[in-house]
């Protein structure tokens, strides 16, 4: 007689084993109809599996986060059901849930097209309208092997081989189609309604390019029609803002096959990069960082000593010279310790903050590369703070202020903060872990910040705080981080002399605000839709001549504006002024200055903003004053 305890503390007694669906039915028909699965003693369970002992039960519906994930996972199985009905010689690989959706990797000699996506989507719609029950079969490993051998599902058999002999395997039966999964899944397809298949892409079995080539079908699913429509609108907007398209359209950068994952910056894009670097450099200087520069290639012996050779060898580019092997640095920290190690350091010298715009290379898989967001060569706004244990909290607190100042400058006001604490496998004493975690916690709490704890997610060498931005499309980008490191200063012999004249290892704080320049610029391109604020824009103002008579004045003003430190260009083509204004607007230039006969007579320009607003007539001194005010605000309106 299982006693079921519900979230409100109430208890229900049942005479025999009971399913989550039956528990829901005992509460009300409406809840039973909405039930997707349950959480039993903190373990997710299918709605139709019997519970035969006293348990704490939470009923899951589509309103719950777990509910929508279960819906999405069930839709992945529906892809399998549909494609197996439509196409022959199809083998199913894996179909997991991802953020906002799901995908299924499929092996087929037939190459799917966008027209096939429509066909598959129509078949899925047909299947879900039949409202069939999804049966769960809990079988032994031997029975699972037999099932998938009969169906010639090669990839499922490979997965089963990795499963231990003991225990049962969950098979899910969608009419004639059978798939395997940990589950849970919806009990009936009436819970599956609001979905869209999105796109096709290529993939490899287990993500290894040496394995079979697969085809991936992506989809999204939501609990309500409005949520689906809102998401598809966001997807459409994201495609409009795609930094790769805008980068090409506005001649910011390009990537080519001869140098995958490495950026060819064009003058417009490089201007943005340089302005961003200058801004960060000023911020660092104001906060007492010392800028350094370290080599690109370093003998592998240093990477062996630091531990990177053992852990990251496959991700490192190497070269050889005179019988020595060098690694192109994938990160800057070991090199920064070499700078710290030059000369004796006293506790009175700490903290020492070493910063570098460090160019790094990592051998990312070609399939993972994505414009500016995932590259092989990137520049970090990297810094390492060498300090005592007692200084950790103050340094972290100051860094948090710095992060918020920079993000606010770019218009990011919603920052998500996560604190990751000690993992099971770690170095360092419990005492120093206690002190470090307490220091990070206090630094956050003293500022009354909301943050999320991630127990056990810290690195083996110390806890960390991660800072993520939420952009205009509600996408989250993890950028900033500050990481406590007890290990590397010891491995690389970094020491200082303490107050008792004893040598001690400093604590090292790894920290970055942007993460990498490439990725952050990619985020900015999409955030601004390439309509950069005036301080960051490749060109801040464009001068347009109305007639050929005004060309000389345009050129003279352009020279004066550039000589005063602004970024200006001209359009003196023999085109109608309306056409020129439209072109300048499409080119995303923040200020558009028109010079005709009337303006030339009074040595001024007719100024308009990118949004079309007429700003009035300005002579050069007043124009410079306006531009200085706009640049000083850095696009902020407060």
UniProtKB/Swiss-Prot annotation:
Co-factor: note: Binds 1 zinc ion per subunit.
GO cellular component: a single term: cytosol
Cofactor(s) listed: Zn(2+)
GO MF annotations in UniProt: ATP binding; metal ion binding; threonine-tRNA ligase activity; tRNA binding
Catalytic activity, as annotated: tRNA(Thr) + L-threonine + ATP = L-threonyl-tRNA(Thr) + AMP + diphosphate + H(+)
Alphabetized UniProt keyword annotations: Aminoacyl-tRNA synthetase, ATP-binding, Cytoplasm, Ligase, Metal-binding, Nucleotide-binding, Protein biosynthesis, RNA-binding, tRNA-binding, Zinc
Region (Catalytic): 242-533
Residue span, TGS domain: 1-61
Signal peptide start-end: none
A biological-process GO annotation: threonyl-tRNA aminoacylation
Gene3D superfamilies the UniProt entry points to: 3.10.20.30, 3.30.54.20, Anticodon-binding domain (3.40.50.800), Bira Bifunctional Protein, Domain 2 (3.30.930.10), Threonyl-trna Synthetase, Chain A, domain 2 (3.30.980.10)
EC number: 6.1.1.3
Membrane-spanning intervals of the chain: none
Subcellular localization(s) per the UniProt record: Cytoplasm
Annotated positions binding Zn(2+): 333, 384, 510
Function description: Catalyzes the attachment of threonine to tRNA(Thr) in a two-step reaction: L-threonine is first activated by ATP to form Thr-AMP and then transferred to the acceptor end of tRNA(Thr). Also edits incorrectly charged L-seryl-tRNA(Thr).
Subunit structure: Homodimer.
Family from the record: Belongs to the class-II aminoacyl-tRNA synthetase family.
The protein, known as: Threonine--tRNA ligase
